Amino acid sequence: MNIRDLGKVAVLLGGRSAEREISLKSGHAVLAALQRSQVDAHAFDPVGQPLEDLLKQGFDRAFIALHGRYGEDGSVQGALELMDLPYTGSGILASALAMDKWRTKMIWQAAGISTPDYVMLDADSNFQEVTDRLGLPLIIKPAREGSTIGLNKVDYAQDMQSAYQTAAQHDSLVIAEQFIQGIELTAAILDDVPLPLVRIDVTEGLYDYQAKYFSESTRYTCPSGLSKILTTRIQEQALYAHRILGCTGWSRVDLILDKNGQPFFLEANTSPGMTNHSLVPMAAQAAGISFDELVIQILELSCEYA
């Protein structure tokens, strides 16, 4: 596609979610890449200016670099569709489903995709029954947050209440999830094609917000070092997990590989990070796709699915 055919592009960044800081980093990295490629691209932060200004300012399409609520949950996608403005990533329904880990897990279970067992929690939950079912340790997290915000690993039953309260500060839907010990992996999908798997090794604790975006000790291996047969099997399952939610364009599917070689899928991200610590650019690089090329490919897909 000719660069001129992309028209005037708004890079949506920042936003109102708890992931605003990361979205600003992703958005500015995307903006710089587009401008290096001679795309007429401009930053647009929905905080402080209404989305309808996109039409008033003559934008032709949007690159969504928003993360979390109001940007990755179908809200912005719906507004852009009402304005008939093409955008990157998945549509309204797939975005909303992927943002909701509870409904994602229900769909994956119905489709035969392995995901850790779970229990939905509320203020009246019997935590003893939860630990009897899921065992310890377990994970407690908000159903509709990203970047592991509000997530805690619970090693002892007496810590269940405080972990629940932390998660409930971020969302009315809270999940207690079976903890799977194993290798943390992520599978990036670009234009319905799985990219090389990324293996994540955290030296201490969980792969949480700090480890994802700020730690210099988190180790990433791409390609993952797994056998070709196992890699292909995981990539195929990740692509199926992406498709069954209705995702289009690009996404990132996170999983744990247990000691028996069984992948357990955790979540799908329809607007993955694009910072210097981010995993999709890392996977693309291993596939021979530079960051600038990746950004252009994602943007071009907004034309295909428009």
From Swiss-Prot:
A biological process term (GO) from this entry: peptidoglycan biosynthetic process
Record keywords, A-Z: ATP-binding, Cell shape, Cell wall biogenesis/degradation, Cytoplasm, Ligase, Magnesium, Manganese, Metal-binding, Nucleotide-binding, Peptidoglycan synthesis
EC numbers for this chain: 6.3.2.4
Signal peptide range: none
Binding site for ATP: 131-186
Residues given in the record as Mg(2+) 1 binding sites: D254, E267
Principal cellular location given in the protein's record: cytoplasm
Database matches in SUPFAM superfamilies: Glutathione synthetase ATP-binding domain-like (SSF56059), PreATP-grasp domain (SSF52440)
Example GO molecular function: D-alanine-D-alanine ligase activity
Cofactor binding remark: Binds 2 magnesium or manganese ions per subunit.
Cofactors that this protein relies on: Mg(2+); Mn(2+)
Family that this chain belongs to: Belongs to the D-alanine--D-alanine ligase family.
Protein name: D-alanine--D-alanine ligase
Organism: Nitrosomonas eutropha (strain DSM 101675 / C91 / Nm57)
Gene behind this protein: ddl
